[in-house]
Amino acid sequence: IRRPPRSTPKPSSAASDVYKRQELITCDISGYSSDGPSREMKAYDMLVQAETGLSSVTGSPREPSRVGVSVCDIAAGMNAHAAILNAIIERKISGKGQAITCSLFDSMAEWMAVPLLHFDYGGKSPKRMGLRHPSIAPYSSFVTKDDKVIVISIQNDREWNKFVVRVLRTPKLLEDKRFSSNIARVRNRKSLEKKIGSYFLSKTSVQLSKLLRQNDIAYGYLNNVEGLSKHSDLRRTTVNTESGPVRIPSPPYRVLGSKNKLKGVPYCGEHTQIVREEFSK
């Protein structure tokens, strides 16, 4: 249950019932930790993105941005789901339930562990760089002759050598000390991206895709939502709703030998009686 401030006493009435029925598992989802100084504050996804510093490392150098999907809501839901499953397993062993609490802030703070550790132990906050990696180069986006955008990722010197010789076809570039190591390439990122960008503008996306794939260079297209909808790797499944069938992305996991079919979306009140009967026992 995602509770607005002051909607229930602390601890919640649901959690208190654990002490009456020891096998009961409850989960309270809130914006901030129930025992923290911000526990009474309202918390919506974008606000938590801002509070946790996520927005400070997202977007272009000119301005911060929100992540395009509600990651704080999703993260809290995933953590709650994992905690409930863990509690179910524990109950099979001990026979006892658990009162679980989970907050959006704590969930996103955990996801921010890497930039947080960079600051706590390195004294530096990561900068916003758009579609660039802060510590690897080249790892950024380039426009092609036919106005497509391709993102490439060169992870080590071996890949860099192959990229220069087989894709850019300018082996003399390997002699340039400005690009002789990843540290040097990051330091001279602007000059590096100018050279690569010039070459990419001379080739179509199809030509570049073929070259990159043939030489096992990591790359991807910068798609929009339409591109995702038409993507050859997108798996879909159909679920029934009150308004009719809807095709949605398939669950990301697959179980060998199972078709992974989803049940229809419950209509309002569909399980009311079942739940009442279960809790009246």
Annotated model-derived regions:
Residues 213-237:
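Conserved PLP cofactor-binding pocket of PLP-dependent enzymes
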Residues 138-215, 219:
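Aromatic-enriched alpha-helical interface/lid elements that frame and gate functional surfaces
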Residues 6, 145-147, 243:
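Glycine-centered tight beta-turn/hairpin loop motif at sheet-sheet or coil-to-beta transitions
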Residues 119-127, 231-241:
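Short, surface-exposed loop/helix-turn segments at secondary-structure junctions
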Residues 17-154:
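Active-site-adjacent "lid/gating" segments in soluble enzymes
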Residues 1-15, 19:
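Single conserved hydrophobic/aromatic residue that forms the stacking wall/gate
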Residues 129-134, 140-141, 187, 243-246, ...:
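Short Gly/Pro-enriched turn/cap motifs at secondary-structure boundaries
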Residues 239-281:
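Flexible, small-/acidic-enriched active-site or ligand-binding loops
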